[in-house]
A protein has these predicted regions:
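Short acidic (Asp/Glu) patches
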Residues: 71-77
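Short, solvent-exposed loop/turn segments at secondary-structure boundaries
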Residues: 55-56, 79-81, 179
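Generic protein-terminus/edge-of-domain signal
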Residues: 1-66, 73, 105-121
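Residues immediately flanking
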Residues: 47, 71, 93-95
């Protein structure tokens, strides 16, 4: 999709003040510990055999699924088959940057808004819409790591376009949380409630 991939970087902090994009393709990856961070994350799952847990919901990932993860949301990757190639594109966006590029009429954080009726972390776009979103991400990735004249401006423009399309998709296609994680006897839900209250 993006032409080239990069080795998986386990860091969970942004180096940039704005946004970062990654294209990972690897096998023999272990489960990732439950974690959170202070930026927005958009995760496009391309291939593999994984589940993703976000705030107590377990999502059985299918190729083309998009996960929207807000700052401070607890999430975890669960690898079901280590020998299977696992490919994904990950976009990190600083909240201040996303607010800065939004307008009063169109907040680009809306797709992450938990208070919106029908909010979900998982989006499953149709084939045509997915193709468009993948194309935008591919171009953004090439520009972000490119060195041609104006590549930073081009990448930022593609980020704007991607976020507008992502918000349109989120507003048009709500999906309910597929599986509540109950293996902990409700402990995770209690911890999340405590964190949200404090």
């Amino acid at each position: 999709m993006c032409g080239r991939t990069q080795p998986f970087d386990p860091r969970q902090q942004m180096k940039s003040q704005g946004y970062e994009i990654f294209h990972y393709k690897d096998s023999q990856l272990d489960n990732v510990a439950v974690h959170h961070h202070d930026f927005f994350e958009v995760y496009l799952f391309l291939s593999g055999n994984v589940d993703y847990s976000v705030e107590g919901c377990i999502y059985h990932m299918e190729g083309g699924d998009l996960l929207l993860i807000s700052p401070q949301e607890l999430h975890q990757l669960k690898v079901n088959a280590k020998e299977t190639m696992y490919e994904r594109i990950v976009l990190w966006i600083a909240p201040a940057y996303l607010s800065k590029i939004s307008t009063a009429e169109a907040s680009l954080t809306r797709c992450f808004d938990h208070s919106r009726p029908g909010h979900t972390n998982l989006l499953r776009p149709g084939k045509n819409r997915l193709g468009g979103l993948r194309g935008i991400l591919s171009e953004m990735y090439q520009e972000f790591y490119g060195n041609e004249y104006g590549h930073e401006i081009a990448a930022s423009g593609l980020l704007l376009r991607f976020m507008v399309e992502l918000n349109r998709l989120a507003l048009a296609q709500p999906v309910a949380c597929p599986d509540q994680e109950d293996r902990s006897g409700g402990f995770i839900q209690q911890v999340l409630a405590y964190i949200n209250d404090h």
